[in-house]
Amino acid sequence: MMKKKLLFFLIIFFSITFNSFSIEPDIFVQSTVNRASKLLGEDITKDKKIEKLKLIAKETVDIRGIGFYTLGKKRKSLNEQEKKRYAELFEEYFLKSFSSRLAEYTNPEIDVQSKEKLNENYTIVNSILKATNERPEIKIDWRIYTKNPDNPLIRDLIIEGLSLARTQKEIGRAHV
């Protein structure tokens, strides 16, 4: 009887403990933005910034999910080996494209404004890229994949209403 009580207690304890480590999507976005902003402000070469941005992207972006979304219905006609090769090529392309564009920014200030839980798998986080003398204020919405609350991932950026994932899909369609 004592073993059952102990087992019950441990199950409850660990389920509460594990759930307490889940990260809220808005905090995840602000943390990711802060990491990237700090990196972009560092006095290191552009190549070093690009390499470090790639690491941040690998940790925070659902590159595989975006890649297969980009592929669309064509994904169903590929065998496992072709899917694996496509995922590798897409990741390489995505990281190079993403990091080289982002490395051009210096000290971007992004403030998270709000979040809207769409369902168990997705939350939209609303933010603003603050205006500077060189650019106006820009509205950025982040589609966060929250199926695993301990590891939220960025699935899309919607910049001033334009979905980067959808744009990528249209570009992909033109080349496939």
Predicted segment positions?
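Positively charged n-region of N-terminal signal peptides that target proteins for export
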Residues: M1-K5
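Boundary at the C-terminal end of the N-terminal hydrophobic targeting segment
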Residues: S20-S22
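Early exported N-terminus immediately downstream of N-terminal targeting peptides
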Residues: E24-L102
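Conserved small/polar residues in nucleotide/adenosyl-binding loops
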Residues: A174-V176
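Bacterial N-terminal signal peptides
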Residues: F8-T17
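Short beta-strand edge/turn micro-motifs at domain boundaries
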Residues: E137-R166
